[in-house]
């Protein structure tokens, strides 16, 4: 099995909206805590490295060598699909280059804007299948398909960010080799354990504070003169 340098390569159009979504997804992926059971089944303790080119490069005949190398050394290609990306010559070249050494199953589509049939690259919307013709011979035919995508469409950046937080599990499930439902359940369990740990810590502090307050009150009862000694001195009888 090939050892990859990057867990994923994020391909996107370098306009403000697409770049924002790519950056948000990048952060979530690299900071995601993989539940222990998923770690055991996937063999991954965390998402180590995600490649995201931050600069728009000039159009040339060939992709830059570092981009080609990063694509070849990435296990998955995360494609941010939008009207801008489908028009981007760079994005289309990145998809074509990736598919030279990877399968279509390793391309993870993210629907940022527009309708799937208008923003997904055509190469991802068809697959070749063997079919038998009327005369009994076998032939290869193209069948239209719609790739499964994480839908992060939103009316503004705030809504898009929220959608990314929700839909990132669909992408992570593919990267970790498990189902979305399994990862979502493990994620909920992990979140619940964290919440219980926090509540346990708060409860512990509350108990300590209560004991301390109780001890202080007992000291007051036993030695009231320690609280305001000046008051008791004022009322000492004079003989």
Regions found by a protein language model. Give the residues of each.
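WD40-repeat beta-propeller superdomains and closely related acidic/aromatic-rich repeat-like regions
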Residues: 224-239
């Amino acid at each position: 099995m090939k050892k990859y340098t990057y867990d994923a390569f994020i391909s996107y159009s370098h306009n403000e909206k697409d770049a924002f979504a790519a950056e948000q997804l990048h952060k979530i992926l690299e900071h995601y805590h993989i539940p222990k059971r998923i770690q055991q089944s996937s063999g991954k303790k965390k998402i180590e490295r995600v490649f995201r080119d931050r600069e728009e490069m000039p159009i040339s005949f060939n992709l830059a060598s570092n981009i080609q190398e990063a694509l070849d050394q990435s296990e998955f290609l995360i494609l941010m699909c939008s009207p801008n990306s489908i028009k981007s010559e760079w994005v289309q070249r990145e998809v074509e280059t990736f598919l030279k050494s990877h399968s279509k199953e390793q391309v993870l589509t993210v629907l940022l804007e527009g309708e799937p049939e208008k923003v997904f690259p055509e190469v991802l919307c068809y697959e070749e299948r063997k079919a038998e013709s009327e005369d009994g011979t076998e032939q290869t035919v193209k069948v239209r398909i719609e790739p499964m995508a994480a839908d992060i469409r939103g009316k503004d950046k705030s809504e898009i960010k929220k959608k990314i937080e929700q839909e990132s599990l669909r992408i992570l499930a593919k990267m970790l080799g498990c189902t979305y439902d399994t990862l979502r359940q493990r994620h909920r369990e992990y979140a619940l354990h964290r919440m219980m740990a926090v509540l346990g810590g708060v409860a512990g502090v509350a108990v300590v504070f209560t004991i301390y307050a109780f001890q202080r009150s007992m000291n007051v009862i036993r030695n009231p003169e320690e609280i305001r000694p000046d008051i008791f001195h004022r009322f000492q009888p004079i003989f």
